[in-house]
């Protein structure tokens, strides 16, 4: 599901709220989450999951075209850990 599909689905379910208001709310929520993570804070949504930053240590990688070694710097990457309720719902679908 893309962001546009999410906005469209939410707007369809909440017909009393203009689509532009739904779009602005989704964009604001995602922006706030990105800002929170960029400040090093963790986001926890009970029953859904948590977002945090994980550190990837510096390492030697390879250029896929040439095979040459490339030194990669350490960096922080976003990480999502699903909550138990979400895992259970996913298992119902997948099982």
Curated annotation (Swiss-Prot):
GO terms for molecular function: DNA binding; structural constituent of chromatin. Heterodimer of an alpha and a beta chain. One of its GO terms (cellular component) is cytosol. The keyword Kinase does not apply. It comes from Erwinia tasmaniensis (strain DSM 17950 / CFBP 7177 / CIP 109463 / NCPPB 4357 / Et1/99). This is Integration host factor subunit beta. This protein is one of the two subunits of integration host factor, a specific DNA-binding protein that functions in genetic recombination as well as in transcriptional and translational control. Belongs to the bacterial histone-like protein family. InterPro entries: Hist_DNA-bd, Histone-like_DNA-bd_CS, IHF-like_DNA-bd_dom_sf, IHF_beta. GO terms for biological process: DNA recombination; regulation of DNA-templated transcription; regulation of translation. The gene is ihfB. Keywords: DNA recombination, DNA-binding, Transcription, Transcription regulation, Translation regulation.
């Amino acid at each position: 599901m893309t962001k546009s599909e999410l906005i469209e689905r939410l707007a369809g379910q909440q017909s009393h709220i203009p689509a532009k208001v739904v779009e602005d709310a989704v964009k604001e929520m995602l922006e706030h989450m990105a800002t929170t993570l960029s400040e090093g804070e963790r986001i926890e949504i009970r029953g859904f999951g948590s977002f945090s930053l994980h550190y990837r240590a510096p390492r030697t990688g390879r250029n896929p075209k040439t095979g040459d070694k490339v030194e990669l710097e350490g960096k922080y990457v976003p990480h999502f850990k699903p909550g138990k309720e979400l895992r259970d719902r996913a298992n119902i679908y997948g099982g």
